[in-house]
Amino acid sequence: MSRAFIIDPTISAIDGLYDLLGIGIPNQGGILYSSLEYFEKALEELAAAFPGDGWLGSAADKYAGKNRNHVNFFQELADLDRQLISLIHDQANAVQTTRDILEGAKKGLEFVRPVAVDLTYIPVVGHALSAAFQAPFCAGAMAVVGGALAYLVVKTLINATQLLKLLAKLAELVAAAIADIISDVADIIKGTLGEVWEFITNALNGLKELWDKLTGWVTGLFSRGWSNLESFFAGVPGLTGATSGLSQVTGLFGAAGLSASSGLAHADSLASSASLPALAGIGGGSGFGGLPSLAQVHAASTRQALRPRADGPVGAAAEQVGGQSQLVSAQGSQGMGGPVGMGGMHPSSGASKGTTTKKYSEGAAAGTEDAERAPVEADAGGGQKVLVRNVV
């Protein structure tokens, strides 16, 4: 048993409490000075990044507002850093103070320990005197240690509360920063999506316009091609209007009571020999237009049959007229399908043949009967004059 049977356990208790206060020198917050320097440098750069007088307008104001928000954010972070440094420093001082108090109490007990040991050598009452001496010193030392520890606990609680406040403020700043960043990112994403949607919309509108133009061009091309094709077929003979053309052609050869395919001319078209087409080489003339009229030929042929052929030039002329009349009669009978002679016309009646005398009241033979009339030049209608000699 130790002679300082009260002081020694007290010193051991103080050493245990001292060990609970940590080993080494408490950190004074020097680890946070580097971050504080970073924040201060960022603040200086942000302050220099504000738009000057050469940049005005809404864009400059918007940039200045964003820059001011960043400055405020870094300024608050720097303030939090300073407060945290101060808090850590205060807590470190409290720990160091508590250590010092415990160290002083321990040293005080160690200082009186030899006295307590010496008192134990007094016979009979030495241990009682030593105990009475050690007890007040140990109680005092433990009171001081208890006070130091209480101070440390209170200081720690205060600093912890301040730390929680700083952490809450830091969380708020970080949340605001994240919200700002998220807002910026959301704005960027929104703007990007808006631009992408606008691009897609414009692209779709452009494709629609291109499709409309393409369909319009193709439709116009087919329309013009179809029109050109119709015009082409319309311009080709026989493809359009063929039926109407054939009907007109067949109508030219139609006759009453006869088929249009028989190829016979209509009887009304032969009413006058002057309307017949010219046939070169017939009778030595230029066509039927050069022949005398049918009435003249009929009269000449009738009178030629009642009288013998005259001699001389007059007879030759009459024969020529008779030959032409026979040719006309043959042509008429072939073209009209009627009786031979004078294009289907009937010869004069027997009454006209039986009349051999006539009294003239006009011309050179006026007032004479059974007289021979002088020759008369008759115009045949085709520009050719025919000498006709009428015999009474």
From Swiss-Prot:
Q: What is the effect of changing F50R?
A: Severely destabilizes EspA and blocks ESX-1 secretion in vitro. Attenuated in cellular models of tuberculosis infection
Set out the biological process GO terms recorded for this chain's protein. Actinobacterium-type cell wall biogenesis; biological process involved in interaction with host; protein secretion by the type VII secretion system
- Record keywords: Disulfide bond, Secreted, Virulence
**Residue ranges of the TM segments:** none
Main subcellular location: secreted
Upregulation details from the record are: Transcriptionally activated by EspR. Repressed by the MprB/MprA two-component system, by direct regulation and via EspR. Up-regulated by the PhoP/PhoR two-component system, via EspR.
Keyword DNA-binding assigned to the entry: answer is no
GO cellular component terms, alphabetically, are:
extracellular region; extracellular space; plasma membrane
Can you say where in the cell this protein is located? Secreted
User: Where does the record place the region Disordered?
Assistant: 302-392
According to its UniProt entry, what is the function of this protein? Required for secretion of EsxA (ESAT-6) and EsxB (CFP-10) and for virulence. Involved in translocation of bacteria from the host (human) phagolysosome to the host cytoplasm.
Please identify the protein, giving its name as recorded: ESX-1 secretion-associated protein EspA
Q: Which organism is it from?
A: Mycobacterium tuberculosis (strain ATCC 25618 / H37Rv)
Organism lineage:
Bacteria, Bacillati, Actinomycetota, Actinomycetes, Mycobacteriales
- This protein's gene is called espA
